[in-house]
C-alpha cells in the first residue's frame, strides 16, 4: 500500500469525525518519488456535507514526522498533533492591531493559546483494547461499520481522483 491507504485513511476519518460530517467531494494529486510501486505523497482538497473545506497533505518523503490536523473555525484554530498526542487551541486575538500594514497583511491575530492536558497512552495498545472490548460487547468507543466503510470510500475516491490527474 501507499501513503493514501496507510495514512490518509486516518486523516480523512479523523476529519469527518471531528467535523461531524461526511465528505461530498475530494480532489487529489499524488507523487511517486522514492521508487516505490505506490504513491508516497498525496495532497487532498475536499469538501464536507456541512460546507467545511479540507486540505490534507500526507507523505512518506519528509525527513521529519509531522502528523497534525488543523481545524480553523470562527473563534480560532484547533491543532491535533496525532503523533505526539497533543491538542492545542489558538484563539483568535481580540485586541486591535494598531500597525495598519501588519493588520492588512496578517488578517486574524493570535490570542490566547490553550494546550490541553491529555493522557498519553500507547496507540496500538489502545487500539487492541478497543478491539477486544468490541468483540466482548463492552464499551462504546467503537467505530461503526458504516463509519469504517465511509473512510474506505473516501480513500478510494482520493486514489481515483489522483489517477485522473
Which role fits each region the language model picked out?
Residues 74-146:
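C-terminal glycine/acidic-rich active-site capping loop/insertion
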Residues 43-44, 99, 159-162:
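Short alpha-helix boundary/capping motifs
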Residues 11-15, 125-129, 155-156:
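A general structural signal for well-ordered alpha-helical segments in protein cores
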Residues 49, 130-165:
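C-terminal helix-rich "cap/oligomerization" subdomain common to oxidoreductases
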Residues 18-21, 74-78, 158-161:
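Phosphate/oxyanion-binding loops and surfaces in catalytic or ligand/nucleic-acid-binding neighborhoods
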